[in-house]
Amino acid sequence: MPAPSKKTLTKPPRRVFQTFMDFPLSTDMDAFDADIAIMGIPHGDPYNIDEVTNDQTNAPTAIRQASDQLIMGSKHWDFDIDSTLLNGRDIKVVDVGDVRADARELSHHYQRAEEAARKVFSTGASLITFGGDHGVPIPVMRALDVL
């Protein structure tokens, strides 16, 4: 299987200026610097072209949009943890956007997702992913081999 193209592995979320909980956007995976990364993997590994776009591909965007209703930023008091979200700790969280999909190279989507996750894990950061379909954890689990 040929390697994915050299363009960026991720792209900004679909809705302009909408990251998860308004955390900073960082799509340059080669200059990645954070303790926690949020990443959308909207597509799974489709069996055919008809399965590429469906409602589950909208999940990362919907979760990001709903995050405004869940919490009003990292300074918001969370009654479940009896503190602010990051509790005053110096924890850097970034949203790295969504893994790019290319309808001409469907077989490379999981490879891109795995490569992006591996880049996050190789920095020592934790990764939170929003999918897509039931297969989204597969490339993330494969990327754990870097640890």
PLM segments and residue spans:
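Metal-dependent C-N hydrolase catalytic cores
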Residues: 2-147
